[in-house]
Amino acid sequence: MSKAKTHSGAAKRFKKTASGYKHKHAFKSHILTKMTTKRKRQLRGTSLLNAADKPAVDRMLRAN
């Protein structure tokens, strides 16, 4: 059986913490002129991964 590999795309996007996985918000890279200042401010920083997505990310990062 081959070695388990970490999903390199997921490894770049998610950081494991004691309370779950930390990730950046989507929709914050380009074409931001249409977006209100309030919305851009809300998308700043990081947030924790939703519990429903945790098993999938666990599988992708299983080799860590």
UniProtKB/Swiss-Prot annotation:
It comes from the Bacteria. HAMAP family: Ribosomal_bL35. The lineage of its organism: Bacteria, Pseudomonadati, Pseudomonadota, Gammaproteobacteria, Cellvibrionales. Keywords: Ribonucleoprotein, Ribosomal protein. Residues 1-51 are annotated as: Disordered. The gene is rpmI. This is Large ribosomal subunit protein bL35. Transmembrane segments: none annotated. GO terms for biological process: translation. One of its GO terms (molecular function) is structural constituent of ribosome. It holds the Pfam family Ribosomal_L35p. GO terms for cellular component: cytosolic large ribosomal subunit. Residues 1-28 have a biased composition (Basic residues). PANTHER family: 54S RIBOSOMAL PROTEIN BL35M (PTHR33343), LARGE RIBOSOMAL SUBUNIT PROTEIN BL35M (PTHR33343:SF1). Belongs to the bacterial ribosomal protein bL35 family. InterPro entries: Ribosomal_bL35, Ribosomal_bL35-like, Ribosomal_bL35_CS, Ribosomal_bL35_sf. The keyword Transcription does not apply. It comes from Saccharophagus degradans (strain 2-40 / ATCC 43961 / DSM 17024).
